[in-house]
């Protein structure tokens, strides 16, 4: 299965992706992990990305897309993947569609983890990260909503909405059921 995972910060995408990756036998590909790996290994893309990150800027779409393309070309992603953190915009969704098309593949679905803002705030505050305060979290949620609403419209009937409140196991069971697994 070739899936994109969407959901606000704190929705539990990473937690669910780890479980789904194991149960479905496909890799969880996170842009955050790709950035860290490429920077850590000193790859040309990593060096380029690090310059933006060090300057406090967003890594441009073309750099991120090249990292994703390189990762999707690896053999373990041939039969499927869980893509987390890309695409974030309609432009990136089009880039992903082109990458898959070039490989004779299509996206099977877009799992959209839905969770209330208050639950996200509660979850993120409980993580105890220094940069997580309520104001910062609500700002990040606003950015996510503005960025992602057009993406949800763009994917239309590929969207698989999952209610992401409750226990990890419950959310995972809902996801697998919605995927027909």
Swiss-Prot record:
Region listing for NMP, in residue ranges: 30-59
GO BP of this protein: AMP salvage
EC number: 2.7.4.3
GO annotation, cellular component aspect: cytoplasm
Cited SUPFAM superfamilies: P-loop containing nucleoside triphosphate hydrolases
Pfam families, sorted: ADK
Entry keyword set: ATP-binding, Cytoplasm, Kinase, Nucleotide biosynthesis, Nucleotide-binding, Transferase
Chain sites annotated for binding AMP: 31, 36, 57-59, 85-88, 92, 129, 140
Pathway: Purine metabolism; AMP biosynthesis via salvage pathway; AMP from ADP: step 1/1
Protein location: Cytoplasm
Ligand binding (ATP): 10-15, 127, 166
Catalysis performed (reactions): AMP + ATP = 2 ADP
GO MF, any single term: adenylate kinase activity
Region (LID): 126-132
Subunit composition and interactions: Monomer.
Free-text domain note: Consists of three domains, a large central CORE domain and two small peripheral domains, NMPbind and LID, which undergo movements during catalysis. The LID domain closes over the site of phosphoryl transfer upon ATP binding. Assembling and dissambling the active center during each catalytic cycle provides an effective means to prevent ATP hydrolysis.
Function per UniProt: Catalyzes the reversible transfer of the terminal phosphate group between ATP and AMP. Plays an important role in cellular energy homeostasis and in adenine nucleotide metabolism.
Similarity-based family: Belongs to the adenylate kinase family.
Record-given protein name: Adenylate kinase
Lineage summary: Bacteria, Bacillati, Actinomycetota, Actinomycetes, Mycobacteriales
Gene name linked to the record: adk
